[in-house]
């Protein structure tokens, strides 16, 4: 059984397909008569109907259109959201329950794609669910979150710059500053947010800053950058797939108020990353790559090195 964690659009993947970290492996082409394949889209979830329609429902529809040959199923990871939706008569399955349900329906091959932004605790939880379900399927592959490779981050930086920065600077004499506010995490994966901040500035978007609610960069770190850049106008943008509770309460509420107390003119663009068509396409590319490639197990690679392969 295989768990393939697939990196999309990366030169490393292209170079290593057929060897190295990834190898070409067409999951659908390997299926035998009677086998059935399914795509499981996994979301953290939201109780906000308005933003769900613009993000989760939108990407669900887009992936179904992109992969008509696959059965489609969705799952939510947030037990709190699942419980609250159930109280409203809306049923959402957890990833493990969804996988076991699909196996009972005769599905043998599964590709799992989450809409997580970073490879943090939510991805860790998802992979554990997949490990629990592995014995019941012939193959399961797990796609990577939005920001996994350097190329992923470069694409996202370019998309956000084109979406917010270029229109703003063409209309305003005073340069506007943009703050991307992520959820953050207590794990080392929080470094991805600092990477994004660095890459935005390295790409010429010096008026873009990244902050997190529960990780690093902190509010104070971001505030120091705004002051160093002599910003006057600030737009807060959720760096999250869905603009739900955090966006409406923490970003448009607490963060906006704290910045206004510092003397900035502040607005909040309550748009989740999942609303942006180009961001949706990155997730679809991850699925596409996952169907055609799988990651080689590290012990398999070390065995090859021990047998005489020269590069490690």
Located regions from the model:
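Catalytic nucleophile-elbow at a beta strand-turn-alpha helix junction centered on a G-D-S/GDSL motif
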Residues: 6, 45-48
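Non-catalytic structural scaffold of enzyme domains
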Residues: 15-40, 47, 53-111, 123-217, ...
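Glycine-rich, histidine-containing beta strand-loop boundary motifs that form or position
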Residues: 114
């Amino acid at each position: 059984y295989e768990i393939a964690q697939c990196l999309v659009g990366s030169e490393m993947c292209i170079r290593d397909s057929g060897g190295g970290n990834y190898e070409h492996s067409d999951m659908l082409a390997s299926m035998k008569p009677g086998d059935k394949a399914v795509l499981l889209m996994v979301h953290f979830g939201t109780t906000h109907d308005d933003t769900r329609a613009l993000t989760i429902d939108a990407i669900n529809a887009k992936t179904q259109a992109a992969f008509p040959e696959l059965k489609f199923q969705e799952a939510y990871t947030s037990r709190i959201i699942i419980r609250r939706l159930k109280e409203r008569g809306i049923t959402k399955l957890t990833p493990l329950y969804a996988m076991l349900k699909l196996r009972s329906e005769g599905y043998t091959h599964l590709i799992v794609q989450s809409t997580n932004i970073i490879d943090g605790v939510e991805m860790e939880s998802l992979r554990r669910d997949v490990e629990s379900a592995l014995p019941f399927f012939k193959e399961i592959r797990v796609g990577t979150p939005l920001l996994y490779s350097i190329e992923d981050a470069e694409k996202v930086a370019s998309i956000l710059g084109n979406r917010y920065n270029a229109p703003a600077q063409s209309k305003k004499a005073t340069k506007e500053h943009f703050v991307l506010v992520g959820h953050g995490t207590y794990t080392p994966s929080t470094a991805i947010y600092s990477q994004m901040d660095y890459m935005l500035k390295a790409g010429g978007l010096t008026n873009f800053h990244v902050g997190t609610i529960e990780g690093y960069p902190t509010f104070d770190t971001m505030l120091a950058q705004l002051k160093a850049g002599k910003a006057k106008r600030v737009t807060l943008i959720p760096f999250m797939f869905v603009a739900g509770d955090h966006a409406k309460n923490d970003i448009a509420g607490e963060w906006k108020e704290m910045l206004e107390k510092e003397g900035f003119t502040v607005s909040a663009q309550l748009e989740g990353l999942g609303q942006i068509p180009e961001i949706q396409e990155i997730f679809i590319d991850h699925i596409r790559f996952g169907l055609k490639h799988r990651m080689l197990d590290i012990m398999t690679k070390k065995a090859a090195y021990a047998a005489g392969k020269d590069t490690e």
